[in-house]
């Protein structure tokens, strides 16, 4: 049996320091700790856009290990990003990182699933590009990265029309 705890709330005054800690934990590859801090901040300030974005990034940092659970939470969180450009851009980041996680995990069909994720990311980057602020070409840089990944790997290709289907006994 798992032990349950009543979590302790942080004070509103502690939010700036907590944000700095979350950023540091992401930098040292302890995204699970950054995720936890973001959850604490969002309990107090649920519309804090910097923290909503950091929460999405902390979750997507962990996709190799927790793909299904993290993706569900990410997709529930992305609509909380209020700026249309940032929402499109970070949705693209989410799909790109999902594709990278699929490639790292490998397995049957992972190349085609990763291809689909990268193509979905590219679509979101194109949406972001269309509404980007002047001088911000981040979406173009990410789109180009996905294009180079797909072009440079024979493992990344769409699912074959005549994909393998196991024979069934009559």
Regions found by a protein language model. Give the residues of each.
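Amphipathic alpha-helical repeat scaffolds of TPR domains
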Residues: 12-17, 45-59, 82-106, 137-149
């Amino acid at each position: 049996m798992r032990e349950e705890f009543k979590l302790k709330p942080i004070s509103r005054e502690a939010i700036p320091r907590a944000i700095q800690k979350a950023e540091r934990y992401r930098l040292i590859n302890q995204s699970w700790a950054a995720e936890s801090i973001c959850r604490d901040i969002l309990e107090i300030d649920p519309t804090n856009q910097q923290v909503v974005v950091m929460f999405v990034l902390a979750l997507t940092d962990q996709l190799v290990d927790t793909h299904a659970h993290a993706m569900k939470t990410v997709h529930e969180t992305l609509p909380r990003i209020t700026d249309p450009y940032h929402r499109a851009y970070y949705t693209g980041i989410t799909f790109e990182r999902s594709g990278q996680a699929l490639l790292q995990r490998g397995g049957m069909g992972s190349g085609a699933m990763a291809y689909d994720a990268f193509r979905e990311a590219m679509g979101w980057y194109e949406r972001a590009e269309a509404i980007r602020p002047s001088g911000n070409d981040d979406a173009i840089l990410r789109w180009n990265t996905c294009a180079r990944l797909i072009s440079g790997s024979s493992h990344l290709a769409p699912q074959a029309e005549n994909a393998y289907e196991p024979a069934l006994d009559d």
